[in-house]
Amino acid sequence: MILYPAIDLLDGRVVRLHKGAFDAVTDYGDDPMRVAEQFGEAGAVWVHIVDLSGARDGARRQGALIRSLCETGLRVQTGGGVRSAEDIEDLLAAGVERVIIGSLAVTDTNRVAGWLQNYGGDRITLALDVRQIGGQYRPALKGWTDMADTTLDDVISAYEGTGLAHALVTDIGRDGDLSGPNIALYKRLATDYPNIDWQASGGVSSLDDLRAARAAGAAGAITGKALYEGRFTVGEAIACLRDA
C-alpha cells in the first residue's frame, strides 16, 4: 500500500481544514517546500497536494509553488480548482504525476471520462468525497457545501470502460478529526470494484488505522493531520506498511 503524506496549501501556507471548512483552519507554517523535503527524507515516494486557494478561486491556483514541489523528487498527486483540459495539461507539464478531479467527476462524467481516455488512467485520480445519507453514500460538491442527487456507486458505474484506475474516497464525517477511516466502506469498494486502486482518506489517526486500511484492500492511504500532530512519522508509517 502506498502512503500519501498530505500537504494542503492555502495562499502558500501549509494548513489543514476541519471537515473542509475554510473557517476552521489549522496553520502549520509557511514552508511547504521544507515539509515536502522532510517527507522525502523520511522515505516517502509520493505526496498528496491540495491547492485550497485554487479550489476556492480558480484565478488563485498556486501553479508556481506546485511546480517547485514537483522538483523535490517526490511523485506528486495534486488537485484543487481543476476545471479544464488546459488545467490538467498545465499540471502535467509542471511535473505532476496524477491530477485529481473532484466535483466535475460527479457533475460532468462525460467530460471527465474523455479526459481519462485522452490522458490515461494513470494520470488522473478521481476524488469522491461522500457523506452517508439514508443508508447510502452520496458525493459532496462545491467544497462539501452541496450534496449530489446521485450515489457513489452510480458515479463509479458511469466510468466503467473508461480506464479509471485511481480514486480516493473521503468520508467527510471523519475528515480531520482522527476518528479512524471508514474501513467497511473501503473494504466494500475494493471488493466491488477491484480494477480501481482505492485510496483511503479521512480519519487516519494511528498505525493500526493504516494496517486496517491495507487489510481492507485499499491501495493507498492519505494522511495529513496525524503526521502534523505527531501521532506517527512518515518513516514509522512506511515501516508499518512494509512489515504488515
Swiss-Prot record:
Cell compartment(s), UniProt: Cytoplasm
Keyword Isomerase: yes
Catalysis performed (reactions): 1-(5-phospho-beta-D-ribosyl)-5-[(5-phospho-beta-D-ribosylamino)methylideneamino]imidazole-4-carboxamide = 5-[(5-phospho-1-deoxy-D-ribulos-1-ylimino)methylamino]-1-(5-phospho-beta-D-ribosyl)imidazole-4-carboxamide
Organism this protein belongs to: Maricaulis maris (strain MCS10)
InterPro entries found in the cross-reference section: Aldolase_TIM, His_biosynth, HisA_bact_arch, Isoase_HisA-like, Isoase_HisA-like_bact, RibuloseP-bd_barrel
GO cellular component, as recorded: cytoplasm
Chain segments annotated as transmembrane: none
One of the record's GO molecular function terms: 1-(5-phosphoribosyl)-5-[(5-phosphoribosylamino)methylideneamino]imidazole-4-carboxamide isomerase activity
Keywords: Amino-acid biosynthesis, Cytoplasm, Histidine biosynthesis, Isomerase
Enzyme class (EC, first level): isomerase
Biological pathway: Amino-acid biosynthesis; L-histidine biosynthesis; L-histidine from 5-phospho-alpha-D-ribose 1-diphosphate: step 4/9
Highest taxon above the source species: Bacteria
Family membership noted in the UniProt record: Belongs to the HisA/HisF family.
Protein name: 1-(5-phosphoribosyl)-5-[(5-phosphoribosylamino)methylideneamino] imidazole-4-carboxamide isomerase
